[in-house]
């Protein structure tokens, strides 16, 4: 499932799983991440998964790019292997004073406020990762009918 493995500087390896962002690709990234973690390969310093990439940093004194690439190329991921997913409930506040974009969304989506919220809350989302702010989820698979572009000029204060 890895499309390409290349150098990322002199002490990191970049595993590319494709350009798309979807559950299947992300699941493969996480399977490789967990498998490599379990193998405890000498010389690997850090593993960083993303939507569709896996970066592996390593200690050049213990392993080189070619040797590590060969190991990664030969890792076998069993199709039936599954990832233990966790289910999280994320509280969302829809009070008027915090719904700064609702009017813009009503106009853009041509939907009433109630329908926007109803459509949003009727679905479970896939969490691709958490990041920057502790626990900040990167959710995916938002219904096409609810998609809107970002503000041209972001708010300075929220």
Outline where the language-model segments fall:
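Conserved "landmark" site that anchors the functional core of diverse proteins
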Residues: 1-158
